């Protein structure tokens, strides 16, 4: 008994010498998955760059998307990707940080991309989202719009749509709405 008491006292003294014991920090599964997704991004910096804010809640990834073809080529478009603790079971929320004239992005920055809604599965990742956004810039979808006026113009008169995109990317007013200057 005396040996046990002596051991307990020695342990207590050793603990006091170390200061307070810290509790181990639990790493969220969503953070582990997000870090893995980011490590696996295999895209050129000429097309996409990103910065992360993993200590925020929800976690955030800022994307700089640079389409190289299509109506929107030549611009850099910034998006915030908000990742909740339920990731990858639920998709991230993606917001465009610019007001742009696009059938699949409304003036509030909401993005209409099927893989962020009904087509989402846990097998998809951040690179899938980046590729999806790039595809929207390469091939805007007039059949599933958030900006119905832009979609109608795209479908009925693609040349007029192109002119409106070019005009809007220079920070001009289209149909009573001012757009952010993307191309200088």
From Swiss-Prot:
EC number: 2.3.2.34
Ranges for domain UBC core: 29-174
Stored InterPro entries: Ub_conjugating_enzyme (IPR050113), UBQ-conjugat_E2_core (IPR000608), UBQ-conjugating_AS (IPR023313), UBQ-conjugating_enzyme/RWD (IPR016135)
Positions annotated as active site in the UniProt record: 112
SUPFAM superfamilies: UBC-like
Entry keyword set: ATP-binding, Nucleotide-binding, Transferase, Ubl conjugation pathway
Keyword Ribonucleoprotein in annotation: no
Gene name of the encoded protein: UBC12
Transferase in keyword set: yes
GO molecular function: ATP binding; NEDD8 conjugating enzyme activity
Its biological purpose: Accepts the ubiquitin-like protein NEDD8/RUB1 from the UBA3-ULA1 E1 complex and catalyzes its covalent attachment to other proteins.
Pfam families, alphabetized: UQ_con (PF00179)
Domain of life assignment: Eukaryota
Gene Ontology biological-process entries: protein neddylation
Identification of the protein by name: NEDD8-conjugating enzyme UBC12
Family classification: Belongs to the ubiquitin-conjugating enzyme family. UBC12 subfamily.
Record's catalysed reaction(s): [E1 NEDD8-activating enzyme]-S-[NEDD8 protein]-yl-L-cysteine + [E2 NEDD8-conjugating enzyme]-L-cysteine = [E1 NEDD8-activating enzyme]-L-cysteine + [E2 NEDD8-conjugating enzyme]-S-[NEDD8-protein]-yl-L-cysteine
Organism of origin: Kluyveromyces lactis (strain ATCC 8585 / CBS 2359 / DSM 70799 / NBRC 1267 / NRRL Y-1140 / WM37) (Yeast)
Pathway(s) where this gene product acts: Protein modification; protein neddylation
